[in-house]
């Protein structure tokens, strides 16, 4: 399965196994993100497309704050918050 990250320079898909927690998914990007994991801001792909922008999705409360126990879902779009 895949999750997505998005920013100014690129949008990227990352492949993970089903049942992967948010910190372990963060580790696919960089071990420092996994080690310093604080939370993940998550929205489903379908919700983002429906709303048209992250700003509108946030205004409607569709962006969730998830912790270390969160199990990643297919098509999640994620912004990882971390501190190392």
Regions found by a protein language model. Give the residues of each.
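Structural motif
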Residues: 73-77
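C-terminal-of-GTPase-core extension/linker across diverse P-loop GTPases
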Residues: 1-71, 83
């Amino acid at each position: 399965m895949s999750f997505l990250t998005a920013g100014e320079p690129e949008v990227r898909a990352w492949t993970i196994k089903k049942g992967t927690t948010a910190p372990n998914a963060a580790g696919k990007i960089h071990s420092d993100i996994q080690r310093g994991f604080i939370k993940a801001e998550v929205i489903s792909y379908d919700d983002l497309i429906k709303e048209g922008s992250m700003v509108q999705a946030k205004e409607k409360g569709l962006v969730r704050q998830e912790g270390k126990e969160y199990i990643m879902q297919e098509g999640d779009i994620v912004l990882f918050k971390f501190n190392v």
